[in-house]
């Protein structure tokens, strides 16, 4: 069985309600993308906890709807346009989508990832390219963190260079557990991972068991008291600023902290908040994202 993919471009103010109308009229799925993606006019668009996004769609939005064989694209498009009061239906193209083995197709899109000097992140359906390397077995899943995002990569490279055997580590905002697992494999002990999402905590526990890495996970109310040799938090800039006092207090005097999920243009603002307790600066930048690193001062 083959499906059809309807692709239309709309102005920002119509994209969301047009997508909703397509779903109501029977589209199997709808996604919205930046019509200027991979061009100089591409626009980043995301929100952070505690902040309201200033936009909910791109200036030129591409709406992509997957249609069952019985749906006529032009008829569906016209009906959706009428539903939201457009004077005319937008121009569109149609692409045939053949039935596929979606599991196999998805797996083919995820290869082992080399990070730093000796780290490999390997999906379960692949063999490690270098058996002597520091291997983390992780499958793409519901929790953030498989090593492909620049911020995860930056934190992993920092941990590889920073963790010494026997040091205590706190991964705040642990997601999939990838950073906590890496810290453990680098010799840290004990290692704790904290996340606000119960599903992420369960995912992290599963990943730690698969990697035979002993890490204690929990929600924020289970965060251990006391201080750590190393604290790492790969979240976003606004939550990092809001939690600056708490995260800084978790670092031992003389201990180190790494922060990411920060765009390069946000680095100074985040660093200024932490400067009250931490001697902090940009450690490394990658693809427009940065990792801040610092040491807690002995006098605080």
From Swiss-Prot:
S-adenosyl-L-methionine binds at residues 152, 173, 195, 234. It catalyses: L-lysyl-[protein] + 3 S-adenosyl-L-methionine = N(6),N(6),N(6)-trimethyl-L-lysyl-[protein] + 3 S-adenosyl-L-homocysteine + 3 H(+). GO terms for biological process: methylation. It is found in: Cytoplasm. The keyword Transmembrane does not apply. Its EC number is 2.1.1.-. CDD domains: AdoMet_MTases. GO terms for molecular function: protein-lysine N-methyltransferase activity. InterPro entries: Ribosomal_L11_MeTrfase_PrmA, Ribosomal_PrmA_MeTrfase, SAM-dependent_MTases_sf. Keywords: Cytoplasm, Methyltransferase, S-adenosyl-L-methionine, Transferase. It comes from the Bacteria. GO terms for cellular component: cytosol. It holds the Pfam family PrmA. Methylates ribosomal protein L11. Belongs to the methyltransferase superfamily. PrmA family. This is Ribosomal protein L11 methyltransferase.
